[in-house]
Amino acid sequence: MTRWALRTATTSYQVRLAPDGAWAELAYWGPAVEETLVPGPLEYAGPTPYSTAADVAACEYAPFGVRHFAQLDLIAEREGGVRGTLWRHSGDDLADKDGTTELRLRFADASQRLTATLCYRVSRDHDVVERWAEITNEADTPLRLERSRSAAFTMPTPGGARLHYLHGRWAQEFQTGQVELRHGRFTLENRLGVTGLAHSPWLAVQPLDEPDGPTWSTALAWSGSWAIDADADSAEGVTRVSLGRLPVEAAIELAPGETFTSPPACGLYSPDGLAGAARAWHAYQRGLRRDVTLPVVYNSWFATEFRVRADEQIQLARKAAAIGVETFVVDDGWFVGRDDDRGGLGDWEPDPAKFPGGFDRFVAQVRELGLGFGLWVEPEGVSPRSRLYAEHPDWVYQVPGRPMTTIRNQYVLNLGRADAAAWAHAALDRLLSRYDISYLKWDMNRPMTERGAGADLDGRHVANYYAILEALRRDHPGVVVEGCAAGGGRADLATVARCDVLWPSDNTGPLDRLVVQHGFLQAFAPHLMSSWVTDDPGFFATSPRSRDFRYVTAMAGVLGIGADISAWDQERLDEAARWISLYRSVRDVVQLGEVHRHGDPRGPFYAVEYARDDTVVLLSWRTGHARGSATHVSRPPRVRPRGVDPAARYRRRDDDSRHSGAALAAAGLAPLPDDTTDASVVILDRV
């Protein structure tokens, strides 16, 4: 039986061909092995009564016609023709270059005139297996793809599976959830046209009886509508996860000779539970990042909202520079017609009434303070009262003759149109070329409705979103791009590959934010997690917490300040300067270090540890009860750092004490020594 063995940094992924060449199946996925004929846990004896071999095999990609009853990844049909596909293996290629291996398995259906290529890519730099499918219409008539997933991954789960997922809503993103699945299907779907707030395109699978052991995790690199199905069969001892796009408006139709390329579905294995899977995702995402320093940002939204005035913004910028902020960002409200959320979107020109001395002069004043300068934009948003809509009403999504839905008082630009996409790119390129801008925050504040007619509307919109981001990064490499969608509504691996940092949630209340960040770090690396210190009391601040608590929470990723610092006295400004200086001294460790989470933020104590090179940073919080003050206990909580070297010695910066790594790992330390402290930063340097 033909078999291909793929190696990642620490794992093996082995694929073999069915005896008749009708499908590829997973033979082994786990810790790295040298053998290519591993008797893996996915072996099967053959079909059971009332099934076929394909329906019980660990099929890597199953079309209807090869499979009949079990989970499917492809459903293709021609008008007036046969619905289904019966293909055979027609060739393969295996290439290895610079530590990256790519496998391409080709299948062909001569009767339906369809070819498919199952694609795999792995690297010795990380443990992620990237997979995608290419479906080509070889006939002279259209081919409809009712379902066209990216890939499927099969995991051994004797006795059933424990599925971990991320769910939420606006201001409550990245909540962790789990479900036990012994039989049947668990589905996550998103039909919004953007990645979504309700669920993340991410899933982790564990055997029910091994919660801290072998863990498989999958994620979809797609920023539109998507679906993930997990089918478990405890009798068979397997769980199969199928991921891919979800064509909401209509099936995807391929013209003669056209090829559909699915977005990548990514999977990884870790022997170390959810924590190990999180670290594996972080390592992969660090490989996607550009070599840029993510600045400490001040964003003026909470200080002024839509009431943007140049003189007030400069006063904020002066104070921001004095406390050590590195980039000043003007959020919503800087452009013409934008005095509230009912106008202006689409007219991306500075409002001369708000910048009477000229926008060039305003930007220069900010830069003269030693600050970078940034702007908020929402390129896909169109206000009904905007000049853009008046001139191009056909550029927004709509169904002729039907009412148009406004959400947040705005429409959505049909980015799938070549002319609209070219206009959006030109508008952004003009801003970045004309003004000395080093930071761009790309927001998207509503889902898609009334998309109308047309081929693959979701695919065309997302493809042009990617193309614009790629062009901006190519032509303006010095600009840091932050991704945002009403908070964390566009957090996915495809956006991660094209943005430098993400905004996880509009909720900056410290207790809520800790929960959001805890879930975010399960799927995404800390260098992607923008987090601000905002005023208390604030809109989301429902429980009393110290200012230290807020700073330590924001230090857990990419620190920013979003408070109205014009109202701060000198004591508060000096306090902010100390925290920012401390963060900048350990920024590389926090953003790029190996992460270990201790406890759960919904409990009385929580800590996050970052280890890189010779430094360990431990952030700790006495979270207390959800609606009350910190819990009073007689013994302070202790943390045993996991990132220390037992053979080394460490100096604790705050008190200059020395400890062996072995003692720290065994006995731990007390980062919050008394009830008067609800948050702390402990830094350990190897000596």
Language model region names:
Residues 1-5, 9, 13, 24-231, ...:
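Polysaccharide-binding surfaces and accessory modules of carbohydrate-active proteins
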Residues 10, 600-646:
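Carbohydrate-binding surface patches
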Residues 53-55, 63-86, 207, 211-226, ...:
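Glycine-rich, aromatic-flanked loop segments that form ligand/cofactor-binding clefts
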Residues 84, 252-270, 679-684:
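Short Pro-Gly-centered flexible turn/kink motifs
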Residues 293-426, 439:
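Aromatic-lined carbohydrate-binding/catalytic grooves of carbohydrate-active enzymes
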Residues 414, 624-687:
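C-terminal beta-sandwich/jelly-roll accessory domains of carbohydrate-active enzymes
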